[in-house]
Regions:
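Active-site beta-loop-alpha junctions of metal-dependent nucleic acid enzymes
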Residues: 33-34, 84-106
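Active-site proximal helix-loop segment of RNase H-like, two-metal nucleases, encompassing DDE(D)
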Residues: 158-177, 195
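Acidic/histidine-rich, metal-coordinating catalytic segments
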Residues: 109-122
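An active-site-proximal beta-strand-loop segment
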Residues: 56-72, 76-78
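Conserved beta-strand -> loop -> alpha-helix junction used to position metal-binding or nucleic-acid-contacting
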Residues: 118, 129-162
Length: 230
């Protein structure tokens, strides 16, 4: 309900009909953080059947007067977000960590990685994917650079970012600590990959396209919680 757009207080009102003594909105928020972190121990280690292109992009946030960034990497075929992180700065080390996670999730399937024109991506992709350089002519990937101001960026990842922006700007707790913001965004990634259906992939979730053998039940959140405990 939370990631679908319902506020914590609206969820509280709903739960009071069933559990009046255990439904304060602060308790609900702690559940969201707890289970997002719990499920991520499972989902962060899954491998997917991807296409041949990944797209990486960043979103700027201002939290408590500071500039922060949400960086995500999407498989353009299945729409599956293969890696993401909420961070204080776009350092080479931070970006490399996210792209390495994308490489781990997709294995050797990727041929193209598309990014914007941010300086430093060449170094990041060299570290994470072995990008071809003057000294390494056996690179398995091509770095496709798209300058947003010149040609526009990929509408698939732009739609994802519009969805995230619309939701996070009103989220209670998102503007608190870095750890809470990171957990909330991890939950958003899980919701996007495993729960939310997409018209662009015939009404399926990205996980149904990318991990068809997973075969989740109707209550996908509960299913993922149980799987993360095994």
């Amino acid at each position: 309900m939370y990631y679908a757009g319902m506020s914590l207080r609206k969820i509280q009102e709903h739960l009071q009909m069933f559990a009046p003594k255990n439904s304060h909105y602060s308790t609900i928020y702690r559940w969201i953080v707890k289970y997002a972190n719990m499920i991520s121990t499972l989902t962060d280690n899954l491998q997917i059947q991807s296409g041949q292109e990944l797209m990486s992009d960043e979103m700027e946030y201002h939290r408590l007067g500071e500039q922060n960034w949400f960086v995500d990497v999407m498989d353009t075929t299945t729409r599956y977000v293969v890696a993401s992180d909420y961070m204080k700065s776009r350092t080479i080390e931070n970006l490399t960590r996210v792209l390495k996670k994308g490489k781990l999730t997709t294995g050797e399937q990727i041929k193209v990685v598309t990014t914007d024109g941010l300086k430093g991506y060449e170094r990041v992709l060299k570290k994470s994917f072995g990008l071809k350089t003057h000294w390494n002519h056996k690179s398995p990937i091509i770095h496709n650079v798209v300058i947003a101001s010149e040609r526009g960026f990929n509408h698939k990842i732009e739609r994802l970012h519009n969805t995230i922006r619309d939701r996070t700007k009103i989220m209670r707790g998102f503007h608190g600590s870095l750890e809470s913001a990171r957990a909330i965004m991890k939950g958003m990634e899980i919701y996007y990959n495993f729960v939310r259906k997409h018209q662009g992939i015939d009404g399926k979730t990205p996980s149904e396209e990318a991990i068809p053998e997973l075969n989740l039940s109707t209550n996908k959140w509960l299913n993922l919680i149980k799987m993360s405990k095994t």
